[in-house]
A protein has these predicted regions:
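A glycine- and small-residue-enriched flexible loop/hinge signal that marks low-structured segments
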Residues: 1-174
């Protein structure tokens, strides 16, 4: 975690699921908190879970150096010519990179302008307004499907429990 040796601003480990690999997810967040110059994207649950399972995992964390997103998304796999379900962190990291390139870190990597996941074929679950509210209130950023808009990141909260400016991804990443 030496800042002088490693220049990083984002840490993720697709497939390292908070509900299954709790110690590894904790270590990733610890590194970000120790360095204070990077941010973690943590996948809350394995494929096939529900809103309650995802929010339960967010409740196990309290950090403004990490965020969770849900549900999983289906993307094309050009190497084998099929489609595959991937953890949210796979697509979310691409949205962070896109956002940083076109708008900089101080803008939210979310919403219809900067949060639409162009490579997504579909989200694992079509979230209702109630689902989105439940997730967001629990600090899980919803990945929603909007007619004519596609699959979109629709939240930018960190895992911090206390309300403050640092409970927003764009503020924490400044």
């Amino acid at each position: 975690s030496n800042q002088d040796e490693y220049d990083i601003n984002l840490i993720l480990a697709p497939g390292i699921i908070n509900s299954v690999h709790t110690a590894v997810a904790s270590k990733i967040i610890d590194v970000c908190e120790d360095r204070e110059d990077c941010f973690a994207i943590i996948d809350p649950v394995i494929y096939g879970k529900n809103v309650g399972d995802a929010t339960e995992q967010a409740e196990t964390r309290d950090s403004n150096f990490a965020a969770m997103y849900w549900p999983w998304i289906k993307v094309p796999d050009s190497q084998i010519g099929t489609q595959r379900w991937v953890p949210p962190s796979v697509a979310v990291s691409g949205i962070y990179a896109f956002n940083d390139k076109v708008a900089h870190e101080w803008f939210a990597p979310a919403g219809l302008n900067r949060g639409t996941i162009d490579t997504a074929i579909q989200a694992e679950r079509k979230l209702t307004n109630s689902d989105r509210d439940t997730l967001y209130d629990s600090s899980v950023n919803p990945i929603a499907t909007f007619p004519g808009q596609g699959v979109t990141i629709f939240g930018q909260k960190t895992l911090q429990k206390k309300s403050s400016a640092l409970d927003r991804v764009n503020v924490r990443r400044l």
